Amino acid sequence: MKQILILSAIASLLVSCVGNKKIAAAKNKLQGIEAQIQQENAEIKNIGTQANNKLQANKIDSNIVTRIDARLAKSTAQLDAAQAKANQLNEILKDKKSTRKNYKSIVLPLLDSLQKQSDLYAQRLSLYLVIKDGLNVADFKQFDLAAFFGPGKYLIPQDKIDIAALSFSPVVDSLMQFSNKYSKYKRTATLIILGFADGTGISTGGELYYTLLDELKKPQAEKEELNQKISELRAKELIKQMTNLYLKKATGFNEADKLKIEYIGQGKGESLPVSTIKDYAIDDERRRIVLCYWVVLPD
């Protein structure tokens, strides 16, 4: 009888020891995964801060920030889901009895799921590198409206189409170079043109005045509305030219099947183009400009 009790006690002790080792191993693995989650969240936060700093410096515009935020939100959602699983595991691992009871049914599957997420960490970091590299090279190109449009015009005349193509060619070339650097990734390139107007009015009763009213679908409009509309029409006209230029250069993009291109043309009206310039006037050629931005982001 004593031998049976001794053997039973030894067996119980061995089971307890094995259980403690498994619990300790699970806790250690979970701690490492949670540390990685925190590190990745810090990386995402750092990129967001970098993007906002670039926005304040006029190196990028709000459209680019929105797209970066949307891309980072995908990763944040994945990390939040992983952290929720980690929290569930932490609750179970607090109690040895609960751990032993749920080890095979809950603990191991959750650890396996978290480990798979962790194994893709290097892959996600490489995507963050693309975003950070894009922010490092980000800048705007400025063009005077007079280079493309006649006074009071919003369509590029035939004799200035080649000038527009030459002006925008370096922009497309820079975008192409960056895109090709990361051609192994599925990615989206965004070209943005923002049109601006100064504070001078548009003569009432003229052809342009009535054309803009037709575009606005209004019988009359304030100066600000008219300037907003003409800046929008000019931006869209330049986007059309940019699209044609891209199509001519499309064969220069590597792995083009992994690349999507989107174009955004927006009129900013009488908004001030560059926040760091503090001495803009109402009638000011520095406000009659177009700003061009681009970004390439991993999908």
What are these regions (language model features)?
Residues 2-299:
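N-terminal targeting segments with Sec-dependent signals, encompassing both cleavable signal peptides
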